[in-house]
Amino acid sequence: MSSTSTRVFKVGIGRFVQQDFNQKAYVRAMRLALLHQYTRLAGLRVSMKEHHGPFFKNYTFFIRHQWAMLNEDIISDMIPQPIHGLYSVTYLGSSSILCKSQIILEKQQKCISTCIAQAVCVSLQNRKPVSFPVAIKEIYSYAALGARPQIAPLLATPEPTQQQIGIQKAFIGETDVDENGHTNNTAYLQFCSDVARKAATDKMFTYVTPDILDSRLKKYTIHYIGETVQGDEVTFTSWQDLQNEYLLHFEAKKDDRVIIRCQFGF
């Protein structure tokens, strides 16, 4: 599929403000994750038009895979800074779409973060994947022309001899869930950040320090395997990969069931 066949939708966001930056003057990864989520949801609303309401009465999207790149060079002298999001669907399958969102600095016209997400159409009744309604297929028909994208295999965890471990339990709270009662994608990223920071502060890792967590996160990848709801207790485990000091691995489990696997790259 040529790039000219992709329809791009602009989404108004607002500004970066001081609270969006950490002590090292880098944009917080969680802030960018929230902006990508907002851009994706707003992009769906704009692109679906009058079909948006009827669709979400019977269906919703489950994010199966998410990859984001963050530009670490954005510093505090750029705030206050107007920003907007760009949203596009780059591939349409029978029950999933590949969404691309970008966060753009309006003054410099510079993309500071790109996110690719595989969104699966699921029934609201049982959360099982279903085929898109005909109306939705027609909206994104232009995205069905390309070759099926290669989705990365499920993230693996390091072997015991290749890792250092930090473990932390968390309860899913009221502010962590969406309107359907399921945990927001960005909440998992925050929990991973929290367990990494505690492990780094407790000097569980050889290489990754709290200072690095504040300044050098360049990308993250998340594979969503299961779901949680308010009140669930989830165990988050983080590993520093001793064979690749620039990677942190994460796994979240409810009882013995894997919910997510995630990587932070520095």
Language-model segment annotations:
Residues 170-263:
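Acidic/His-leaning functional-site neighborhoods
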Residues 1-40, 117-118, 122-127, 132-135, ...:
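Catalytic strand-loop segment that frames the active site of acyl-thioester-processing enzymes
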Residues 2-13, 67-82, 86-155, 224-235, ...:
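HotDog/MaoC-like acyl-thioester-processing domains
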Residues 1-82, 196, 200, 204-213, ...:
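Hydrophobic, proline/glycine-rich low-complexity stretches
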Residues 59, 109, 160-162, 214, ...:
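A generic structural signal for short, solvent-exposed coil/turn residues
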Residues 50-58, 62, 87-89, 217, ...:
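A structural signal for short, hydrophobic beta-strand segments that form beta-sheets
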